[in-house]
Curated annotation (Swiss-Prot):
Keywords, alphabetical: Acetylation, Cytoplasm, Initiation factor, Phosphoprotein, Protein biosynthesis
Basic residues compositional bias, start-end: 41-51
GO biological process: cytoplasmic translational initiation; hippocampus development; myelination; oligodendrocyte development; ovarian follicle development; response to glucose; response to heat; response to peptide hormone
Residues recorded as bearing N-acetylalanine in the entry: A2
Subcellular location: Cytoplasm, Cytosol
Top-level taxon of the source organism: Eukaryota
Quaternary context: Component of the translation initiation factor 2B (eIF2B) complex which is a heterodecamer of two sets of five different subunits: alpha, beta, gamma, delta and epsilon. Subunits alpha, beta and delta comprise a regulatory subcomplex and subunits epsilon and gamma comprise a catalytic subcomplex. Within the complex, the hexameric regulatory complex resides at the center, with the two heterodimeric catalytic subcomplexes bound on opposite sides.
Family: Belongs to the eIF-2B alpha/beta/delta subunits family.
Compositional bias (Basic and acidic residues): 8-20, 31-40, 96-121, 161-174
Residue numbers carrying Phosphothreonine: T86
Principal location listed in the UniProt entry: cytoplasm
The protein, known as: Translation initiation factor eIF2B subunit delta
Modified residues (Phosphoserine): S12
Length: 524
């Protein structure tokens, strides 16, 4: 078939040559306009004819190759005879080239399978050797690893080496932990970080040491209060800072802050508001020009901290209070949980503006923060009721709305707040009561979390002991090997249980958190 295609091409070329040859009688005189047009038409037809012949040749070549693929034995025999004629090679009697090639391929597959089996014996099963069905799986193979990323021993050892390099004391675990939360550090007020710390020779600034102790003892609590206290401590660090010789303030100050942050984390895990404030401060420090004098740079940093507190916390809470007061009407029964400084301000300002409503304060052990909220509202003259969280379902039928604070708002719209918030939101949804969450945008974080197991905080388990007179319930619980106490600090409320989030930017749904984060990152 290839020879036929070559013959057809040669014949067509000879015909085109005869067509392109000059006509007899045309030489020696100038062509008229009609003859020129006729010649152009003939050239176009010849060009079209060449294209058609070229396409036919390609179809013939593809047909030949397809026929060869369909009958590879004949092709191999032909090539084998050609090779044998040229090189003198002789095939074994009664065996074709295709059969020899198939035999070689089978040997290669057997060798490859043997190598994979040897690798599986040395370093575990290879991906190809793993069974694809449940029937092929053996009982010795574990589908789930023994350790996840959070409780991996190598990762935990690496995290412990970091404070040692920074000369920061580490807190030891206290008591036995629940297995689901074994990857989280267990804090206790009985073990002090500063017990064996020498303040004069320590790398930690005294203001940071005092702040860490206040965090660990619970003297400073609440996201806003902890963030403001941290920023004020940073101002004291800046005031006492002196740039070493042959160093730049923008680099040395950031490195000096790292052990301070590690010490505060050992005292109590950082909140989302504190992490965002530290990111802001580091950005201000690294963006400081090296040509500025030290006193001028320190003054600008302290002014930036004051501006951050004023804009992100003070003015933001004022704007949220104005937006939230529009949702409070006369005769409302508002349920609040725990003690949120922002929610307390909203209720007191709405009462001062003339709106008349009633508040139900729900509280929970062991912190009993709702007592402080109760004291503030009663002092402002707001009619208030007080109860514990197990009785919340009995008062929800008469509640008109639930007003909650937030520890952080995650990127997937989940609300991280005091443990028990998710329970209240779930019961409120069952009674068709709207849930409103008040939160500043500086508490928005890019972390995604769907449960309270992976990332959380474990408080002192001794706080769960109940003292009644001289008797202490759960005394010496550490000696009981079958007893473990769990004192969780936060839980995660899914966005489906939250109707509205009130921020200084306005009232938004939980699904708008990624939009706010993207706008904030573009503005910065």
């Amino acid at each position: 078939m290839a020879a036929v295609a070559v013959a057809v091409r040669e014949e067509s070329r000879s015909e085109m040559k005869t067509e392109l040859s000059p006509r007899p009688g045309a030489a020696g005189r100038e062509l008229t306009q009609e003859e020129k047009l006729q010649l152009r038409k003939e050239k176009k037809q010849q060009k079209k004819k060449r294209k058609e012949e070229k396409g036919a040749d390609q179809e013939i070549g593809s047909a030949v190759s397809a026929a060869q693929r369909q009958d590879p034995v004949r092709e191999l025999q032909g090539t084998g005879s050609q090779l044998g004629g040229t090189t003198g090679e002789k095939l074994p009697a009664g065996r074709s080239k295709a059969e020899l090639r198939a035999e070689r391929r089978a040997k290669q597959e057997a060798e490859r399978a043997l190598k994979q089996a040897r690798k599986g014996e040395q370093g575990g099963p290879s991906p190809q050797a793993c069974p694809s069905t449940a029937g092929e799986a053996t009982s010795g193979v574990k589908r789930v690893p023994e350790h996840t990323q959070a409780d991996d021993p190598t990762l935990l050892r690496r995290l412990l080496r970091k404070p040692d390099r920074q000369q920061v004391p580490t807190r030891k675990d206290y008591g036995s932990k629940v297995s689901l939360f074994s990857h989280l550090p267990q804090y206790s007020r009985q073990s002090s970080l500063t017990q064996y710390m020498s303040i004069p020779s320590s790398v930690i600034h005294p203001a940071m040491v005092r702040l860490g102790l206040q965090y660990s003892q619970g003297l400073v609590s609440g996201s806003n209060a902890r963030c403001i206290a941290l920023l004020h401590a940073l101002q004291q660090v800046i005031q006492d800072y002196t740039t070493p010789p042959n160093e730049e303030l923008s680099r040395d100050l950031v490195n000096k802050l790292k052990p301070y942050i590690s010490f505060l984390t050992q005292c109590r895990p950082m909140s989302a508001s504190m992490c965002n404030a530290i990111k802001f401060f580091n950005k201000e420090v690294t963006g400081m020009s090296s040509s500025k004098r030290e006193e001028e740079a320190k003054s600008e940093l302290k002014e930036a901290i004051d501006r951050y507190v004023q804009e992100k916390i003070v003015l933001a809470s004022q704007a949220i209070s104005r937006f939230a007061s529009k949702k409070i009407s006369d005769g409302d029964v508002i349920l609040v949980y725990g003690c949120s400084s922002l929610v307390s301000r909203i209720l007191q300002e709405a009462w001062v503006e003339g709106r008349r409503f009633r508040v139900v304060v729900v509280d929970s052990r062991p912190r009993l923060e709702g007592r402080h909220m109760l004291h503030c509202l009663v002092r402002a003259g707001v009619p208030t009721s007080y109860l514990l969280i197990p009785a919340a379902s009995y008062v929800l039928p008469e509640v008109s709305k639930v007003l909650l604070g937030a520890h952080a708002l995650l990127a997937n719209g989940s609300v991280m707040s005091r443990v028990g918030t998710a329970q209240l939101a779930l019961v409120a949804r069952a009674h068709n009561v709207p849930v409103l969450v008040c939160c500043e945008t500086y508490k928005f974080c890019e972390r995604v979390q769907t449960d309270a197991f992976v990332s959380n905080e474990l408080d002192d388990p001794d706080d769960l002991q109940c003292k009644r007179g001289d008797q202490v319930t759960l005394a010496n619980w550490q000696n009981n090997s079958s007893l473990r106490l769990l004192n969780l600090v936060y839980d995660v409320t899914p966005p489906e249980l939250v109707d509205l989030v009130i921020t200084e930017l306005g009232m938004i749904p939980c699904s708008s958190v990624p939009v706010v984060l993207r706008v904030k990152s573009s503005d910065q």
